[in-house]
Amino acid sequence: MKDHEYHALTDAFFQYVEDTVDAGYPDIDCERAGGVLTLSFENKTKVIINKQEPLHQIWVATRENGFHFELQGETWIDNRFGHELKALLTKACTTQAGESVVFP
């Protein structure tokens, strides 16, 4: 994958996360700064999603663990645990928000 393709894919994913949060979860604050997207919850916990351009990965830090996602076909898959990115965000955000959060 070329760098410009990676940036287009990650930018689109970041926008998808922002749009999902803004449309349905007013108690979650979403802030993007450069290649980092931070989701902040009322209980002061955070989920941090960031680009790792040299590796063409997306890294996610949650209260539980850190995850490194690589694009496999059209799906971002964690290279250690095999989690799909949207499913991992759904689980982590639901846990940290204390209410159902879904990234379809």
From Swiss-Prot:
UniProt-recorded name of the protein: Iron-sulfur cluster assembly protein CyaY
Cellular component terms, GO, for this chain's entry? cytosol
> Which NCBIfam families did the record assign?
FeS_CyaY
Q: Which Gene3D superfamilies match?
A: Frataxin/CyaY
Q: What is the protein's known function?
A: Involved in iron-sulfur (Fe-S) cluster assembly. May act as a regulator of Fe-S biogenesis.
Originating species: Aeromonas salmonicida (strain A449)
What family, per the record?
Belongs to the frataxin family.
Molecular function as annotated in GO: ferric iron binding; ferrous iron binding
Q: Is Iron included in the keywords of this UniProt record?
A: yes
User: Mind telling me which CDD domains this protein's record contains?
Assistant: Frataxin
